[in-house]
């Protein structure tokens, strides 16, 4: 019996650390597409495994936060949806969105953005998102300007420049 007890205790400890690691890991990697599902699973298991006082309190807070931040970016998503040009520029500027999602359509990239914000959870999800919007906007314009400059300089000027130099 004495042997059984420590192993049990050890098991619970291990499970607890696993759930915490799961949380940390899932928060750390915003590349997961199923963050919502993972979070709900983590919350379920966390409250199940870890001490109910700790687990449920922490995890319910997490869940509330997640939904909160999840809902906020979706609101900004609608405005993005209304403005496809902004959406397009944002997709170009942000390296996080791979081209396939661009090609597949707005729905996919929309969900991608929302999970991205969810991954950034700690309070920056929303702040960073808003910042991104303004930054991305300016960045898109800047990028456009510099791109057109580069293309004009590199493309036309070098072409028209080298024959002129030859002449």
From Swiss-Prot:
The modification N6-acetyllysine is found at residue 121. Its main location: membrane. GO terms for molecular function: structural constituent of myelin sheath. The keyword Acetylation applies. It is a peripheral membrane protein. The modification Symmetric dimethylarginine is found at residue 106. Residues 46-114, 136-167 are annotated as: Disordered. Residues 114-122 are annotated as: Induces experimental autoimmune encephalomyelitis (EAE) 2. Keywords: Acetylation, Autoimmune encephalomyelitis, Cell membrane, Citrullination, Membrane, Methylation, Phosphoprotein. The modification Phosphothreonine is found at residues 17, 20, 35, 67, 94, 97. The record marks 89-90, 113-114 as: Cleavage. Belongs to the myelin basic protein family. This is Myelin basic protein. It comes from Cavia porcellus (Guinea pig). The gene is MBP.
């Amino acid at each position: 019996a004495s042997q059984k007890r420590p192993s049990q205790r050890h098991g619970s400890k291990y499970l607890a650390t696993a759930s915490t690691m799961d949380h940390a890991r899932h928060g750390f990697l915003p590349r997961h597409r199923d963050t919502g599902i993972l979070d709900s699973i983590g919350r379920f298991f966390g409250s199940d495994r870890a001490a109910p006082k700790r687990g449920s309190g922490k995890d319910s807070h997490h869940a509330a936060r997640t939904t909160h931040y999840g809902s906020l970016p979706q609101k900004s998503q609608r405005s993005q949806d209304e403005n496809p040009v902004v959406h397009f520029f944002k997709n170009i500027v942000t390296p996080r969105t791979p081209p396939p999602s661009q090609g597949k359509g707005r729905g996919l990239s929309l969900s991608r953005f929302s999970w991205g914000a969810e991954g950034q959870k700690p309070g920056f999800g929303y702040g960073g998102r808003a910042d991104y919007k303004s930054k991305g906007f300016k960045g898109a314009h800047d990028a456009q300007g510099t791109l057109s400059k580069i293309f004009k300089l590199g493309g036309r000027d070098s072409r028209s420049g080298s024959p002129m130099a030859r002449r």
